[in-house]
Amino acid sequence: MSASKIPLFKMKGLLLFLSLVKMSLAVPAFPQQPGAQGMAPPGMASLSLETMRQLGSLQGLNALSQYSRLGFGKALNSLWLHGLLPPHNSFPWIGPREHETQQYEYSLPVHPPPLPSQPSLQPHQPGLKPFLQPTAATGVQVTPQKPGPHPPMHPGQLPLQEGELIAPDEPQVAPSENPPTPEVPIMDFADPQFPTVFQIAHSLSRGPMAHNKVPTFYPGMFYMSYGANQLNAPARIGFMSSEEMPGERGSPMAYGTLFPGYGGFRQTLRGLNQNSPKGGDFTVEVDSPVSVTKGPEKGEGPEGSPLQEASPDKGENPALLSQMAPGAHAGLLAFPNDHIPNMARGPAGQRLLGVTPAAADPLITPELAEVYETYGADVTTPLGDGEATMDITMSPDTQQPPMPGNKVHQPQVHNAWRFQEP
């Protein structure tokens, strides 16, 4: 009986041992490294998304901050995407996200390349032909289409697109092409260039409308593109309309709005406080000629401006406001009833008369001084409210009620610190 029991106990022990081995293999006491056997080695490439999120949200200091432009870290990712944080110096190739769909206000010297989805825009600009270089591009685009069924279709388009000598005749030629426009898909149906021909004819039919719109392209403003927070770049001055004012996207002053202790290198090294537009682009609206021509020497500003409403006898305490720290920003530490007067006066509550601090006068560049003297006390100049432009807590609805007399200049103040949606 003992001889028959021993193999049974051995079999039970073997089964228990095998089941224990199987369980130890199934439930890993030592978890494997993330990354499959034949896949990437355990390292950065095999981190899971959850691990990246945990690494990215370590109390605002993320271990993957240099990759947060690429979408790994979550803590500083929104700041990076909005251009509040400068790109890392160790990764200079990670530039600012200049989307192709970014809306520019088209001006004379600067033209972004047209989108591939908008091939009809180049022939669509008849008034811009004598000024711009895309005329040669349009001529090159149309030349391969001339041998096709194009000349019997459009008798006026060949001399129209061939050179700029016929450019003054475009408003006369374009209305004559309105009847043949529906026939373009019929004639060029089998042509591989049919969509381009149809779009050219369609844009030619809309030629007079675009020709009438040409003066709106040059209202006297110019656009200067810049990378986010190029700290070594000089202060740039651009004139844009109030619809296109994106605010200071990557300036250290805007970053100082979220973190009041951070003043930026330019301000601390040069001794300038927050009236300096260095470190970001400096745009002045030129919508109303009254606001541009009227400077600090010609009065407080345009009629009904917040500067006149923000007099010290209106209940404001200038002594209390002047006691603010120089690093205190108007968007963060202003009293709730003083939002508009404080923004119009500057970060410390003083009126922007001289406009630069006395200590900063020998250090300031002549262009910067000229801008200060010309546009110092104007509402449309984001000098003192450069920090407040980036303040997320303020909304345009909270700012409109305190200024009842500013119906003319209210849209400019309203749009001066709104981001342009891409």
From Swiss-Prot:
The modification Hydroxyproline is found at residue 42. GO terms for cellular component: extracellular region. Keywords: Biomineralization, Extracellular matrix, Glycoprotein, Hydroxylation, Phosphoprotein, Secreted, Signal. It comes from the Eukaryota. It is found in: Secreted, Extracellular space, Extracellular matrix. Residues 271-321 are annotated as: Disordered. Pfam families: Amelin (PF05111). InterPro entries: Amelin. One of its GO terms (biological process) is cell adhesion. Glycans are attached at residue 117. One of its GO terms (molecular function) is growth factor activity. The modification Phosphoserine is found at residue 48. Ameloblast-specific. Residues 1-26 form the signal peptide. SMART domains: Amelin. Involved in the mineralization and structural organization of enamel. Belongs to the ameloblastin family. This is Ameloblastin. It comes from Rattus norvegicus (Rat). The gene is Ambn.
